[in-house]
Regions:
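Globular "head" domains of long coiled-coil molecular machines
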Residues: 10-13, 35, 39-307
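Charged, amphipathic alpha-helical linker segments immediately N-terminal to NTP-binding catalytic cores
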Residues: 1-26
Length: 307
């Protein structure tokens, strides 16, 4: 397996410390947060958030580079996708965190609203659609549903699909799932696979932001076929920036597609770096450009890693 990405992340510890200090100097994070992050880096506890828009290949990447198998499903919709936390364990097992009774009541209220009433309001329409989808999938639990709310549930690794699969029994009430996996390079590492930003499930989006704020590094996955488009720019500058943009690492996924079309790795990297620089200027914040200039995109290919 090609584990260069995690080796490179480990080698970037000193760089992360420097970037964290700069992030504090520019006011992106507090001195207390700076000290917390640096202590965690020095103590070999590395939390990596993996983000990216739909179709950027996050699940395929994690399956190839972490699990070496098709573990995480790629077909789950943004409406029902749970936050996944991957870390080391002596054996393969999972622990699911379910929505609280209060959070579930909020979803029931959203689901009771008419789509016609929110027509034209994209954000509210998304919330209502998500809630209705959750309620529809919740029928699988029947009258036992309420007994799970507010609880954590451990289960065998073989049942992971029941919590993260599109048709899983518990997908409707699962806010996050922790996956324990016996890989040496996961020792002292916590990889957080996020559903994304602008999440229609407010409580889940808050959990995503919470994890990204404590992350030592954030791996932003770009698709080589359309690297750093308007959606990527929004994710980086409007969302990740609030969590401390100095800790961002850019990964260009599926670069082999562009490579086969005649582009070299160097050309792809230079293109992305220039796009980031131009976007930082367009956002009118030179400090962003300064923080990101030390970020060198890492070419990734889940498909090539499996060959």
């Amino acid at each position: 397996m090609n584990t260069n990405i995690f080796e490179e992340l480990s080698q970037k510890k000193q760089s992360l410390i420097s970037l964290t200090q700069k992030a504090k100097d520019y006011g992106w994070i507090t001195p207390q947060k700076e000290e917390e992050i640096i202590n965690r880096i020095k103590n070999d506890v590395l939390t990596i958030g993996v983000i990216g828009q739909m179709k950027s290949g996050k699940s395929t990447f994690l399956n190839a580079f972490v699990f070496e198998d098709d573990v995480l499903p790629a077909a789950t919709t943004p409406m029902t996708a749970a936050l996944s936390i991957i870390t080391y364990g002596e054996k393969k097992e999972i622990e699911a965190e379910f929505y609280t009774p209060q959070e579930w009541e909020e979803q029931k209220m959203q689901a009771s609203r008419s789509l016609e009433d929110v027509k034209g309001n994209e954000i509210e329409e998304s919330k209502v659609k998500a809630a209705k989808e959750l309620m529809e999938k919740a029928h699988k639990l029947g009258s036992s549903l309420e007994s799970f709310l507010g609880k954590n549930q451990k289960d065998t690794f073989e049942n992971l699909e029941e919590y993260v699969g599109a048709d899983g029994k518990y997908i409707s009430i699962t806010k996050a799932v922790k996956i324990y996996y016996p890989k040496e390079y996961l020792k002292g590492v916590e990889i957080v696979d996020t559903p994304g930003f602008n999440d229609p499930i407010v409580s889940r989006e808050e959990r995503t932001k919470e994890f990204l704020e404590k992350a030592d590094a954030v791996l932003l996955m770009l698709y080589a076929g359309r690297p750093f488009d308007s959606t990527d720019r929004s994710i980086l500058f409007e969302n990740v920036g609030k969590c401390g943009i100095g800790k961002v690492i850019i990964g260009i996924n599926k670069y082999d597609i562009a490579y086969e079309n005649g582009d070299t790795i160097e050309e792809i990297n230079e293109y992305v770096k220039q796009q980031i620089k131009d976007a930082a200027k367009n956002y009118g914040n030179e400090t962003l450009s300064d923080l990101l200039k030390e970020t060198s995109p890492i070419p990734l290919s889940a498909e090539m890693a499996r060959r």
